[in-house]
Amino acid sequence: MKKLVLTLAAVILSAGLMSAQDMAKATETAQSANDALVAKDYAKALAGFKEALTLAEACGDEGAELVGTCKSVIPNIVLSMAKNDIKEAKYDEGVAQLEEAIKIAEQYGAADVIDDAKTLIPQVKKSKATALFTAKDYAAAADAFKAIIAEDPADGASALRLAMALTNTGDKEGAIAAFEQAAANGQEANAVKQLANIYLKDAQALLKENKLKEAIAACEKSNEYVESANAYKLAASAATKLKDNAKAIGFYEKYLGVSPDAKDAGAIAFTLGALYQQASNKAKAIEFYTKASADAQYGAQAKQQLEALKK
């Protein structure tokens, strides 16, 4: 019995010595990892603290404090690695590291790292999309902004950038939808200008193709977003070619209403005078010929018409 007790004592002493040696190894490994962290060698630091954690966990209660330290440091190292990737414009790698940081932080209870990483992820995705747009890689930028909006449909600023990217890829319908989404989410002022411009360009192209009714419809659509003198003038031109004088008169009058001091205001007033004269509306013809009478180019003709109308 005495021999058995002595044997057990030897085993316990040996285990104690081994535990002390393991703890010393864990501490030494953690110290080396910390030195690497100070030197910003994050990969070496991460590997070191992971090894120290495993060693400390094997030491039971003696290693509890070091276990806590390692679990506190490891998520922050991964977060630092992510931030380093982001600084180097390695956006995909940065996002992957941030997601890894969240995973580890959830396992180790590092709430501050979780909050920081979750805040950074959408910012990094936007940085990537913006960088692609700046580099004029519009197709890739569009894909990046689509992914952002899929996660946050209320992100009007990203919807606006998506619309601009799609415009540059020639996806007009996609751009229109994105501009509409941007307008509905805080970017109305910028989005409606772009929408108005899209339809105005359509109107110009349709007018050149002699698709007159379609050109008028595009002008009217443009004016639904932002009223413009150019849209009214194009619509008036199309209506004149269609010999729809009533519509032409309406569009020209709106043109002058929006841009009364336009360089061609005199010419438009003279045109209106002539259109009203053709419509046998003497009073309105006189009104607009009078407005045109001071015009350098059309003034003389306007005065002649006024004299004829007043007879």
Regions found by a protein language model. Give the residues of each.
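TPR alpha-solenoid repeat register
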Residues: 62, 110-111, 117, 158, ...
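N-terminal leader/linker segments that initiate helical-solenoid repeat arrays
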Residues: 2, 6, 13, 17-83, ...
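Canonical tetratricopeptide repeat
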Residues: 65-69, 73, 80, 113, ...
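Short coil turns that delineate tetratricopeptide repeat
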Residues: 57, 106, 153, 186-187, ...
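Residue-level recognition of tetratricopeptide repeat
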Residues: 34, 76, 83, 130, ...
